[in-house]
Swiss-Prot record:
Gene: nuoB
Alphabetized SUPFAM superfamilies for the sequence: HydA/Nqo6-like
S-adenosyl-L-methionine in keyword set: no
Quaternary assembly: NDH-1 is composed of 14 different subunits. Subunits NuoB, C, D, E, F, and G constitute the peripheral sector of the complex.
PROSITE patterns: COMPLEX1_20K
Protein name per the record: NADH-quinone oxidoreductase subunit B
Catalytic activity, as annotated: a quinone + NADH + 5 H(+)(in) = a quinol + NAD(+) + 4 H(+)(out)
Disulfide bonds: none
Compartment annotation: Cell inner membrane
Length: 177
């Protein structure tokens, strides 16, 4: 009995055929793509974020919505309800007493959902890291996609984190997460 050690090329012919079809139709105004790519493209331009402001980082988070930075030009708009939002921005010190509320709000968000951890306190406890009542990073309660460092981070840093999240969504998939 012999074992085949050749690499698996299943689907390679289909990929080559799709690329050839794309080249042929490109000049005619058509585009061949998958529905998942279209969904990822649309989702990156229409993220709805929900604030979970717990401390001074929340003030900088508010600045991103003001006219100077205008986060809506990047396709991200604030929402008041977790059921209408795709992104949760955790900004500030997360205490042990507040952790169950954070998890409950996260569970109410529809899939796919993303979390941005903003500031040193949300990232790892910050100044209050050794306090008995502080969670040493919100990633112990909810899965975090993007970390924004700083104490408090600037509005520009948060905007950069939002752009990184959009890039991550485009690069990975939103359907199977």
């Amino acid at each position: 009995m012999s074992v085949a050690t050749n690499p698996n090329h299943a689907g390679a012919d289909r990929e080559v055929g799709t690329q050839a079809l794309n080249r042929e139709l490109q000049d005619k105004g058509f585009l061949v793509t998958s529905s998942e790519d279209i969904i990822n493209w649309a989702r990156t331009g229409s993220l709805h974020w929900m604030t979970f402001g717990l401390a001074c980082c929340a003030v900088e988070m508010m600045h991103t919505s003001m006219p100077r930075y205008d986060a809506e030009r990047f396709g991200i708009a604030p929402r008041a309800s977790p059921r209408q939002s795709d992104v949760m921005i955790v900004a500030g010190t997360l205490t042990n007493k507040m952790a169950p509320a954070l998890r409950k709000v996260y569970d109410q968000m529809p899939e796919p959902r993303y979390v941005i951890s903003m500031g040193s306190c949300a990232n790892g406890g910050g100044y209050y890291h050794y306090s008995y009542s502080v969670v040493r990073g919100c990633d112990r309660i909810v899965p975090v996609d993007i970390y924004v460092p700083g104490c408090p981070p600037t509005a520009e840093a948060l905007l950069y984190g939002i752009l990184q999240l959009q890039r991550k969504i485009r690069r990975t998939g939103t359907i199977a997460r």
